[in-house]
From Swiss-Prot:
Keywords: Leucine-rich repeat, Methylation, Repeat, Ubl conjugation pathway. This is F-box/LRR-repeat protein 16. Residues 94-139 form the F-box domain. It comes from the Eukaryota. The gene is FBXL16. Residues 1-62 are annotated as: Disordered. InterPro entries: F-box-like_dom_sf (IPR036047), F-box_LRR-repeat (IPR050648), Leu-rich_rpt (IPR001611), Leu-rich_rpt_Cys-con_subtyp (IPR006553), LRR_dom_sf (IPR032675). It comes from Homo sapiens (Human). One of its GO terms (cellular component) is cytosol. LRR repeats lie at residues 244-266, 267-290, 319-343, 345-369, 371-395, 396-420, 446-470. Pfam families: LRR_6.
Amino acid sequence: MSSPGIDGDPKPPCLPRNGLVKLPGQPNGLGAASITKGTPATKNRPCQPPPPPTLPPPSLAAPLSRAALAGGPCTPAGGPASALAPGHPAERPPLATDEKILNGLFWYFSACEKCVLAQVCKAWRRVLYQPKFWAGLTPVLHAKELYNVLPGGEKEFVNLQGFAARGFEGFCLVGVSDLDICEFIDNYALSKKGVKAMSLKRSTITDAGLEVMLEQMQGVVRLELSGCNDFTEAGLWSSLSARITSLSVSDCINVADDAIAAISQLLPNLAELSLQAYHVTDTALAYFTARQGHSTHTLRLLSCWEITNHGVVNVVHSLPNLTALSLSGCSKVTDDGVELVAENLRKLRSLDLSWCPRITDMALEYVACDLHRLEELVLDRCVRITDTGLSYLSTMSSLRSLYLRWCCQVQDFGLKHLLALGSLRLLSLAGCPLLTTTGLSGLVQLQELEELELTNCPGATPELFKYFSQHLPRCLVIE
């Protein structure tokens, strides 16, 4: 963070993506824009009493003063406020600082734009700093942005008061060390009770740092550790708290089977677990017990290359209440594993089988027969899926989202089966090389479709996109 913003806010560049928003450091971005106000001409009529004085309506006659923009009193174009006749009705606030108007107006701006607008004047900042405008956003702070360099070369921690005013419940810290985390806890007033979610990415946090963070920040219930290679499984044993309900661990080289043992024993209230670890085996999944079975509803096993159908057996028996399951990149899972999932996890609403090269059409038959509540199915890079598999899916009346990216055997005939999915809202066919313009044009029958992805499809021509714009006007077509 190169310099502090208003109230000492750090000002990194803006990066809105996947729910993460970096607070920007631009100067006042309004340029020469101004709000104007004028007074219409009036004539005295000798036989009529003069009309009562009224507030001048907005026009383009004269610019609003800088003081008015900053929240000061507004002076009409006809003269100073002191020249108004006695008994003149009280002035309304100028439109530029009318909080009722601003509260409605600011909803139309992105998070990055709000950061710039908050620097216009105190009145705008006061309105924009209400927590309602920042709900669901997570500030992303890099290690170098946490400090200001003083003239003597010393560093001081930035003022985070502006973050507290906006009521952020989560932070993402990138490239931080144990010391940086301790400084954050000491300098952010809400760190111990007000922060509910912490994400550490590409950081050098150790077992000791992880333990201190979770011990001091008693409000944290959602934790993400990504690319942190200095903590070990022993650190998880010593630091994890039963209050944690959501845990995500990815690209941390010291995470293996024993980490799952710690998670299963120390987190009885865990509702969501996302794990990307190349060294986790079927043995780890045997650690899950009935304790997690009642609370855990989401499990994502991403690129866990060593997990086989035996591991899937442990999952379906220990976690029967799952509503979302991802086996993305679990390349040893076969149709038999999918059959176990379909027969035992009847509450599933989301299933991700992407990058499972051993999955065939038979797996889709199991899914269609047993998972009647399924709303989302991800089959990206399942290269053995053919039109026959899509024919099984045509009976799934609840399916709303279907991803078939780079399913290289899907052809036009398979698309005809999808036309029976009247509830489908999102369809991705990116990278399917055998689909023709004729086959794709038939998708206009899916009138409820809201998003259609056709990137890298040879059959997706400019004429086809024009055809979709005419016949699927409410659908976002991604070229």
